[in-house]
């Protein structure tokens, strides 16, 4: 395992340092070769670091900045007023070479915009996309993109997403000739928007890609495809629906029902009578799959959910470290040139 420095926007997310700082400590404890640059308000950060071991503290650098990018502002306003914010400074640290990757739970549109401006897309890529690993019910994994970076996409955009997703799956999931599917409202060739049908035609013509056809939302976790492609609007809605359903079912299993009389009954039934199903459901814990990567850029940028808890944000940090050590942007560029 090689030494690595990541830049964190610790002010991003719904709660900020009270989540991101404990997450940083979890990540450092699990990865002894990792160092972190913490961008944010030092008055909020330093009290959370008072009682940590010296060996851990020496791998942390607090970079004070008092400004943040608010989720309430639109993309144009956020970009115009981004100078000196925790998000921009974290990305600039990667641009300058002070860090090799960046993690933020802040405004998705601003993160996408600033990353494109400061880090630049890979040669030939029209639009970077948000990609995430998702679990399957059989214990496997798939990748899904775009998850919200690009709301409107044409056929060429979707084709490029499929290409990047295939290379990403090859290098992160160790898959050979990953199966690609387009997320659609039906499996028939005539279903869906024109852009999706046209993208299907492009994919069918490319023998280098293992395109298998359309996939419907009810089969996303069934392991029928290794790479699931959609525009950012559809992908974001689908992913959040999956995550919400998984969290609600897991809460039910753990006996968190509002009906106190049913709590013990549900918990006992699901952990004893349906034990095998319970073990499968535990694999679909959204916290363990927190973090979507902005692929198609020259460096690793990972977007955490704004509502992530400390364990989930720590997973996003670990994901950024893994991708950086695996040199995923370089491998995507090499793959693009090959195709």
From Swiss-Prot:
Catalytic activity: a fatty acyl-[ACP] + phosphate = an acyl phosphate + holo-[ACP]
GO cellular component, one term: cytoplasm
Cellular localisation: Cytoplasm
Signal peptide: none
Domain of life of the native organism: Bacteria
GO biological process, one term: phospholipid biosynthetic process
EC class name: transferase
Subcellular location, principal: cytoplasm
Keywords on record: Cytoplasm, Lipid biosynthesis, Lipid metabolism, Phospholipid biosynthesis, Phospholipid metabolism, Transferase
One GO MF term: phosphate:acyl-[acyl carrier protein] acyltransferase activity
Annotated metabolic or biological route of this protein: Lipid metabolism; phospholipid metabolism
EC code: 2.3.1.274
Pfam families on file: FA_synthesis
InterPro entries: FA_synthesis (IPR003664), Phospholipid_synth_PlsX-like (IPR012281)
Similarity field: Belongs to the PlsX family.
Record note on quaternary structure: Homodimer. Probably interacts with PlsY.
Function, in words: Catalyzes the reversible formation of acyl-phosphate (acyl-PO(4)) from acyl-[acyl-carrier-protein] (acyl-ACP). This enzyme utilizes acyl-ACP as fatty acyl donor, but not acyl-CoA.
Listed name of the protein: Phosphate acyltransferase
Origin species: Pasteurella multocida (strain Pm70)
């Amino acid at each position: 395992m090689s030494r690595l420095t990541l830049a964190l926007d610790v002010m991003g997310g719904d709660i900020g340092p009270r989540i991101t700082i404990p997450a940083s400590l979890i990540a450092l404890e699990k990865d002894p070769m990792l160092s972190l640059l913490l961008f944010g308000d030092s008055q909020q950060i330093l009290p959370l670091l008072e009682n940590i071991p010296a060996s851990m503290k020496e791998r942390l650098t607090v970079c004070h900045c008092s400004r943040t990018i608010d989720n309430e502002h639109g993309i144009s306003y956020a970009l115009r007023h981004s100078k000196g914010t925790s998000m921009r400074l974290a990305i600039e640290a990667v641009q300058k070479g002070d860090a090799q990757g960046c993690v933020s739970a802040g405004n998705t549109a601003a993160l996408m915009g600033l990353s494109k401006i400061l880090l630049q897309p890979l040669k030939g890529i029209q639009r970077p996309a948000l990609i995430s690993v998702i679990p399957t019910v059989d214990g496997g994994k798939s990748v899904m993109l775009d998850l919200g970076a690009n709301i409107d996409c044409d056929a060429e955009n979707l084709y490029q997403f499929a290409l990047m997703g295939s290379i990403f799956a090859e290098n992160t999931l160790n898959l050979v000739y990953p199966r690609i599917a387009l997320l659609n409202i039906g499996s028939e060739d005539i279903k869906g928007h024109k852009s999706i049908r046209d993208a299907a035609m492009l994919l069918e013509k490319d023998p280098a890609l293992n395109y298998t056809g359309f996939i419907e939302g009810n089969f996303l976790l069934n392991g029928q495809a290794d790479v699931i492609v959609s525009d950012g609007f559809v992908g974001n809605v689908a992913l959040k629906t999956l995550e919400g359903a998984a969290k609600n079912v897991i809460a039910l299993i753990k006996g968190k029902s509002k009906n106190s009389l049913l709590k013990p009954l549900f918990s006992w039934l699901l952990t004893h009578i349906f034990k095998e199903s319970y073990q499968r459901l535990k694999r679909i814990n959204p916290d363990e799959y927190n973090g979507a990567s902005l692929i198609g850029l020259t460096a690793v940028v990972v977007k955490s959910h704004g509502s992530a808890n400390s364990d989930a944000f720590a997973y996003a940090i670990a994901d950024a470290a893994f991708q950086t050590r695996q040199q995923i942007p370089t491998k995507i560029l090499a793959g693009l040139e090959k195709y």
